[in-house]
From Swiss-Prot:
Homology family: Belongs to the variable small protein (Vsp) family.
Highest taxon in the source lineage: Bacteria
Protein name: Variable small protein 8
Signal peptide coordinates: 1-18
Species annotation: Borrelia hermsii
Any one Gene Ontology cellular component term annotated for this protein: cell outer membrane
A Pfam family that the UniProt record links to this protein: Lipoprotein_6
Extra remark: Genes for both Vlp and Vsp families are on (usually) unnamed linear plasmids in B.hermsii HS1.
Keyword annotations: Cell outer membrane, Lipoprotein, Membrane, Palmitate, Plasmid, Signal
Lipidation (N-palmitoyl cysteine): 19
Amino acid sequence: MRKRISAIIMTLFMVFMSCNNGGPELKSDEVAKSDGTVLDLAKISKKIKDAVEFAASVKEIETLVKSIDELAKAIGKKIKQNSEDLEVDNGKNNKNGELVAGAFQVMLTVKAKLEKLGNTPEISEELKGKITDSKSKCKEFVDKVKADSDISKAEATDEHVKKAIDQVNAPAGEKGVVELVKLNKSIGELLKAANAAAEAAIAELTAPVKAEKPSQNN
């Protein structure tokens, strides 16, 4: 995000330097392009800032959702002593309640962040629709997991938990994975739209001046 903000600042500087201040009287936060187009830098800068921050928030949510995949790798495992690897925990196999609780808490955090994101002012109807879809998919996952008696207990088995959170080894898992797959897809589409909105805001500032057509008079 820092790189993107730095690029925006540089773009603002370049636009300012390339604009001329001739023509109509301008306000302190306005500049004019060579074709006479007046840019409200304060307004455009805020629009870019808001769009970039929104996209960063969506990216954070996507990272949280994808972290479930990392938690799934620890199903039935323990840390191998003096190693950076995991190994099967024969003494605690089929006792994944705490692991599921961790994944569930991550998803509750995602749910809360999506709710907050939905209250963002001045976002497009497209983004509002995609947020609503992601909220719905998140709720479906949460509802599925919390209602499953095989999952909501300390002795949750490896097999059952894989069907809840392991997209790799149980892609059709009926205890939550199906809903998790849908949520991942929905969040991915939301992030794509958020990035597009940020790029559009930047493009509004950097749009090239239209070249004047040559005169047809001889």
